[in-house]
Design a protein with these regions (language model features):
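Conserved nucleotide-sensing/catalytic segment adjacent to the nucleotide-binding pocket
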Residues: 36, 40-93
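Hydrophobic/basic alpha-helical segments enriched in Actinobacteria
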Residues: 6, 11-21, 48-61, 118
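Short secondary-structure boundary/capping segments
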Residues: 2, 9, 77-81, 103-107
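Conserved NTP phosphate-binding and transfer environment spanning the P-loop NTPase/kinase superfamily
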Residues: 82-146
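Glycine-rich phosphate-binding P-loop
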Residues: 14-35
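Extreme N-terminal, non-catalytic leader segments
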Residues: 1-15, 52, 134, 139, ...
Length: 146
């Protein structure tokens, strides 16, 4: 098992989207916007990853399961899910406007597509969903749910 810190993950359509970036970069804000659009929280500020032989499964860490920080509100509890990791978005204000192809990133021995991603605009959740659909790993045949 691998534990990633300072990352947030959500499940969309049965696949996990991992969001990384420095503190205050908008990871939780993007996750909340995606949750508002129907995604489920996997983990905020930490995510467990387990290789199940076919995919890398992202799941909530037990010590913060279901908890997410909402700036200016506090810590709230939300429903959680687990899902195969399909895409990593790295929040970067200097992300190129038109990335040609996602880079491949090896996490716990599994190659995962990774994209730089400009944070903070009004449609970032919609852009993240399109990035997952366009660049993410295909949906594996696993028992993971959204």
């Amino acid at each position: 098992m691998t534990v990633l810190a300072n990352v947030t993950a959500v499940a969309i359509g049965g696949r996990a989207l991992l969001i990384e970036g420095p503190p205050g970069s908008g990871k939780s804000s993007l996750a909340l916007a995606l949750i508002d659009r129907g995604a489920l929280l996997i983990g905020d500020d930490a995510v467990h990853l387990v290789h199940d032989g076919a995919a890398l499964i992202a799941s909530p860490p037990p010590n913060t399961c279901g908890l997410i920080e909402i700036r200016n509100v506090g810590i709230v509890e939300l429903p959680v899910s687990s899902a195969p990791l399909a895409l990593v978005l790295t929040l970067d204000p200097d992300a190129p406007r038109f990335p040609l192809d996602p880079a491949m990133r090896t996490i716990a021995g599994v190659d995962i597509p990774s994209l730089p991603f400009a944070p903070g605009d009004a449609v970032q959740a919609l852009r993240a969903e399109y990035a997952l659909a366009h660049h993410g790993l295909p949906f594996p045949n696993s028992g993971a749910t959204q």
